From Swiss-Prot:
Localisation per UniProt entry: Golgi apparatus; Cell projection, Cilium
Origin species: Mus musculus (Mouse)
Keyword field contains Phosphoprotein: yes
Gene transcribed to yield this protein: Fhdc1
Gene3D superfamilies tied to this protein: Formin, FH2 domain (1.20.58.2220)
Name under which the protein is recorded: FH2 domain-containing protein 1
Span list, region Disordered: 18-79, 464-540, 554-660, 681-1149
Biased composition (Basic and acidic residues): 464-485, 784-795, 844-856, 1123-1134
Bias kind Polar residues: ranges: 486-504, 554-575, 591-604, 681-693, 926-947, 1042-1052, 1064-1074
Length: 1149
């Protein structure tokens, strides 16, 4: 139970004396394991130790001693003093205060008189003593504690606690605690605080503090208890002491209340003065603000207007509460209501009215005030002061203390009362001013209405201002837009206002088609310019061709107007003249014989167009040979057709007014690419051209009186330049133009001479502007078909406006070939002009007269014709010269040409001129071969699709047959119906895919020299041309109506001239199909015919076997032409290998 005992037990456990513990539990004494501690000051006498046992203590029986255990020291003498000592309370106890050990003790009654561990330990405790000195050092407190402290702790302290408990009986413990906490904040003794209360010194305490003291005042019972306390006051607690002292002050409660009132009166009085002053000022503002009154009158007027005729109309006033309903009345204008309108009207009347709220400042301040609250505060202050004044009279001392304050308070309260009365009066006046009921309308409510009205009115003013600003900005933007629109409409921005197409359509709608010719004239190059769409479908090509045919017709009849007017159609070159068609020419000219027309115009063209210098440099023979064919292409150069779209008539077929358009200078200028000269075989070129002329010459054209000759006469405008230029002018200008126009026109096919010329000179010139070429793809088979003839017939008959350039080209090239076949020096005056006239006339007007070949060259579309011509020329050049040809605009490649007019097979077949049935070979194939140049153009339009290998064009029928599927009804397809079939040659509709700048192998000289001189371009005619060459000189009797036709000429040519040679020349069309076929047949043809076959287009190559036999008559001449033609075609081939290689390889295989 005692500390020492615990320590002893712990020591025993540490020493492992469990036996001793067990002995204590059983009441035995175990021998001490360690030497006994020093005995107390009066040590008891030591007992003898026996090694075998312990000295038993007398009272309890000792257990048997453990063997070997040390003897147990003798127990202390029995008695409480020993226990007292053990507990440390004896005189021998600690002299130093120790730290407390917080444990829970067992009550003494539970330990005494019972056998337990604690009683056992008490008996043996004298043997196990704690070292007091050590424990005091370790756990003793530094300060000395007197021995009396212990008894004080047990006695005196307990007595003090007992005294406190007695005071607590006076005050509740919790209350005493709260009071004590409150008193500690003053840092003063309770007596000092009570003294200040007694003297009325409130300066050191706040009103809140004094109010707290009032709350802590003792109750009556507590007062009684405190008064009944007679003990030492110093022994009372802080709270009890404070209350005991406080109750000793007389009227302590009244004094404290007086102190609180004195402390709060001034602040409360000042606040009341301020509030009353504010309310009075607000009342005056509402009554004196004229701007507010004006606004209210505006509201009254607006309300009367809106309510006119109703029960609420014609009002003389309105309740103030109605002001808040203004914003609820919405206007028709979004975001606007009646309040906005009133603000807007106030702004119109006077902008000062909008600022009325600035004069109601005190009204805004009244938001935190209330008249009722102010009156209540004033009344409370007055009651308190009066009560204090009455109560203070009982205590003279207190009365003296508060006298001054009370006097001051009474005065202030009287003043406040006066102000309150004035405020009330003014409030009533204000309510009456606004005609409100004093009973129901309170001053606070009135102020609140005007506060809200001011806020809403200011917001409405701001909204109006924002709206006006927004409208102003919007108007400004609109004005700017109007100015821009005006500037655009007035053309300030130049040509960007409207597109040329819009202007063109509008003008055409107003003026009709009379201005169409102007659209077809060259257009200045511009960023917006683009070549005609190369992906036109056949239908679109046909429509475009029809439209352009109309244009050509119009232009032929109408005087040349401003060339740039409505020039919306793209042109390959602004310098190219629009090709004229024979049927476009005035009928007076048409009535003239072909010779008559051709010669004068040819001379004119020769005069107009001086030969280029490079042409002059060329061998005369070479220049002369192409001269005849080139004049067709070259002289008709002013009338150069676009490969894609322009009619066959390349020569100046236009009426005399249009003749000025045929400028030789243009021809020279059109040469855009580098010109390559092939001086190797000028003679061969000459010969080839002569052969071609001869071949064409044998193909005798009917007299001008014939229907076919009439078309030639019509085409005479374009042909005469060619005729006259045939040798001289042709070689310079004609060659140039021809090289330019050869690709687009079938003229390239017309004669080997032309091909050679092109090979040498035009080879580089062969490059034709892509304007029309883009839309053209070589379609030899298609072009070779009796498209030229058929097309010509249909175009002439239908007036589609789709004059197949192929036909015209073919015709022109044939004419040139005829002229070339006559001696180079000579220009076949009647015959060549006749043939040329026939060709041109056939092209523009009597395309049937061109014969089936001419029809074949006449492609369904101008694009086709143009492409065909350009391709054959390219073929010839490539053969003749390895150098890559420079592509230039051909006469058939007028800038104006955009689309090919697809001519229905029936229409082409139904050409007015029927040629005698060609030999089955030549008929289908030959006609295409003669038409190859135009057809190749068509193939250039369709050629891509037609690139599939076709039978050799040498035999017109053979080569034609593949085309016949396309141009069913072509002349070759219908040998019996030569004339109609010839028109069908133009069956071949240009492939939608145009080939651009694809060098075409020049048709072999055989083709060129094919008697289809009227349509040298058509590959079909070319194969027959070799045969016809001989026949043309010995033409079998042919009906007059068919003599001028290409069919008749091709027949005769077929009979005589070796078709292979001519096919090669005519194959100049080099449609992709022909090129493919060329792989096989052209090789054979080239072997037989030499360069002429090489020049022939792929179809011509196909036809080569057939035409080779037919062309045996003219082998020599054709061979000569072949040399040149092959060189040129070789050039074209080389240049076109890249593009045509892909097409030719499969076909050749």
């Amino acid at each position: 139970m005692h500390v020492m005992n615990c320590v002893s037990l712990a020591s025993d456990k540490e020493n492992g004396t469990l036996a001793t513990a067990a002995a204590f539990m059983t009441g035995q004494t175990s021998p001490s394991a360690s030497p006994p501690p020093p005995p107390p000051p009066p040590p008891p006498p030591p007992c003898p130790h026996s090694g075998e046992g312990f000295s038993p203590s007398p009272p309890p029986p000792l257990p048997p001693p453990l063997p070997g255990g040390p003897p147990i020291p003798p127990p202390p003498p029995p008695g409480l003093p020993s226990v007292s000592y053990l507990n440390g309370y004896s005189s021998l106890g600690k002299k130093k205060r120790m730290r407390s050990f917080f444990w829970k003790t067992i009550p003494e009654e539970q330990v005494r008189g019972k056998t337990n561990i604690w009683t056992l330990a008490a008996k043996q405790q004298h043997q196990y003593q704690i070292d007091k000195k050590t424990i005091e050092e370790l756990f003793g407190q530094q300060e000395d504690t007197s021995k009396a402290s212990l008894p004080k702790r047990g006695g005196a302290l307990n007595s003090s606690f007992r005294d406190a408990r007695e005071e607590v009986t006076v005050l509740d413990a919790k209350r005493s605690m709260n009071i004590g906490i409150f008193l500690k904040q003053f840092k003063k003794s309770p007596q000092s605080i009570v003294e200040d209360i007694y003297q009325g010194k409130s300066e050191h305490y706040g009103s809140e503090t004094l109010r707290e003291i009032l709350k802590l005042l003792p109750e009556s019972e507590e007062v009684k208890k405190l008064k009944a306390f007679n003990g030492d006051v110093s022994k009372l607690s802080l709270a009890d002491s404070f209350l005991h002292c406080l109750i000793q002050v007389p009227n302590y409660s009244l004094r404290i209340e007086a102190m609180v009132l004195k402390k709060e009166f001034l602040p409360s009085c000042s606040s009341l003065f301020k509030d009353i002053r504010t309310l009075r000022a607000a009342t005056k503002e509402l009554m004196l603000c004229e701007e507010l009154h004006s606004i209210l009158h505006l509201v009254l007027q607006a309300g009367n207007i809106m309510n006119a005729g109703g029960y609420a109309g014609n009002a003389v006033g309105f309740k103030l509460s109605s002001l808040l309903k203004l914003a609820d009345t919405k206007a028709n204008k979004p975001g606007m209501n009646l309040l906005h309108f009133v603000a807007q009207e106030a702004q119109k009347q006077d902008a000062i009215l909008l600022n009325f709220s600035e004069k109601l400042q005190h009204v805004q301040e009244t938001s935190r005030l209330s008249l009722d609250i102010t009156e209540a505060e004033l009344h409370s202050l007055f009651v308190r002061t009066k009560s204090l004044q009455e109560n203070i009279q009982l205590d003279q001392e207190l009365c003296q203390q508060m006298e001054d304050f009370l006097q001051f308070a009474v005065e202030k309260l009287a003043e406040l009362e006066l102000w309150k009365r004035e405020l009330q009066g003014e409030a009533h006046t204000l309510i009456d001013f606004f005609c409100e009921d004093k009973e129901t309308m309170k001053l606070d409510e009135c102020f609140q209405i005007f506060r809200d009205f001011c806020t809403r009115f200011n917001k409405a003013v701001k909204d109006n201002h924002d709206r006006e600003e927004q409208e102003r900005k919007q108007l400004q933007r609109q004005k700017e837009m109007e100015q821009k629109r005006y500037s655009w409409s007035t053309g300030e921005l130049g040509s960007f206002g409207r597109s040329s197409s819009e202007n063109d359509v509008q003008m055409l709608a107003k003026t009709g088609t009379e201005d169409l010719p102007s659209f077809l004239k060259p257009r200045p190059n511009s960023p917006s310019y683009r070549p005609p769409n190369t992906r036109r479908s056949r239908l679109s090509l046909g429509i475009s061709a029809d439209r352009e045919l109309l244009t050509f017709l119009e232009s032929a009849t109408s005087s040349p107007e401003d060339p740039n007017k409505f020039n919306s159609l793209p042109r390959s070159s602004p310098r190219q003249a629009r090709p004229t068609i024979a049927w476009m020419e005035p009928r007076e000219q048409q009535s003239h014989g072909p010779n008559f027309t051709h010669e004068p115009q040819a001379s004119k063209i020769q005069e107009k167009a001086p030969p280029p210098a490079w042409q002059n440099q060329l061998p005369t023979t070479w220049r002369e040979e192409p001269a005849s064919p080139l004049p067709l292409a070259g002289r008709s150069r002013p009338s150069l057709r676009k490969r894609n779209s322009e009619p066959v008539g390349l020569g100046p077929t236009q009426s005399p007014p249009l003749l000025p358009l045929d400028l030789g200078v243009r021809e020279h200028e059109l040469v855009t690419g580098l010109t390559q000269f092939d001086l190797q075989s000028p003679k061969s070129l000459e010969e080839g051209s002569q052969l071609t002329l001869n071949d064409f010459c044998p193909t005798k054209l009917p007299s001008p009186g014939d229907r076919s000759s009439q078309p030639f006469a019509a085409g005479g405008d374009s042909l005469p330049p060619k005729d006259t230029d045939t040798q001289e002018v042709l070689s310079p200008a004609g060659e140039d133009d021809r090289t330019i126009s050869d690709e687009p026109s079938s003229e390239a096919l017309v004669s080997v001479v032309v091909t050679d010329t092109e090979d040498k000179d035009a080879g580089p010139l062969l490059y034709v502007s892509d304007t029309t070429d883009c839309s053209l793809t070589l379609d030899c088979s298609e072009g070779m078909d009796s498209r030229a003839g058929g097309d010509k017939q249909e175009e002439e008959k239908e007036g589609d406006g789709s004059v197949s350039s192929g036909a015209g080209e073919a015709g022109s090239s044939q004419v040139s070939s005829n002229s070339v076949s006559s001696p180079p020096g000579e220009v076949p005056a009647p015959k060549s002009s006749k043939s040329e006239l026939s060709c041109q006339g056939g092209l523009p007007k009597d395309r049937p007269s061109r014969g089936k070949d001419a029809i074949a060259p006449k492609r369904n579309s101008f694009k086709e014709a143009s492409v065909g011509a350009s391709k054959p020329v390219s073929a010839r050049r490539s053969q003749g010269v390895t150098t890559k040809p420079v592509r230039t605009l051909n006469s058939s490649e007028n800038e104006h040409m955009r689309k090919v007019v697809p001519i229905s097979k029936s229409s082409r077949g139904a050409g007015p001129w029927k040629r005698p049935e060609p030999t089955p070979k030549a008929t289908p194939r030959e006609t295409p071969s003669s038409t190859d140049t135009p057809l190749s153009r068509r193939s250039s339009v369709r050629g891509t699709s037609d690139t599939s290998p076709r039978r050799p064009q040498v035999s017109g029928s053979g080569a034609e047959e593949p085309r016949l599927p396309r141009s069913s009804g072509s002349i070759s397809g219908r040998p019996g119906k030569d004339a109609p079939l010839q028109p069908r040659a133009s069956f071949r509709k240009p492939s939608a895919k145009p080939l651009r700048n694809i060098p075409r192998q020049k048709p072999e000289e055989n083709k060129v020299s094919s008697p289809n001189s009227p349509d040298p371009e058509s590959p079909k005619e070319e194969p027959k041309a070799p045969q016809a060459t001989g026949v043309s000189r010995a033409l079998p009797p042919i009906p007059s109506f068919a003599r001028n036709t290409v069919a008749s000429s091709s027949r005769s040519l077929r009979t005589d001239a070796p078709p292979a040679a001519r096919t090669t020349g005519l194959t100049r069309t080099v449609s992709q199909r022909q090129l493919r076929v060329k792989g096989g047949s052209e090789d054979s043809a080239s072997k037989d015919i030499g360069t002429l076959k090489r020049a022939s287009s792929a179809r011509a190559s196909k036809k080569c076997p057939e035409s080779a036999g037919g062309s045996s008559a003219n082998v020599e001449t054709s061979l000569k032409g072949r040399g040149t033609t092959e060189r040129s075609s070789l050039r074209l081939k080389d240049s076109g290998q890249a593009t045509l290689g892909r097409i030719l390889r499969p076909l050749q295989k």
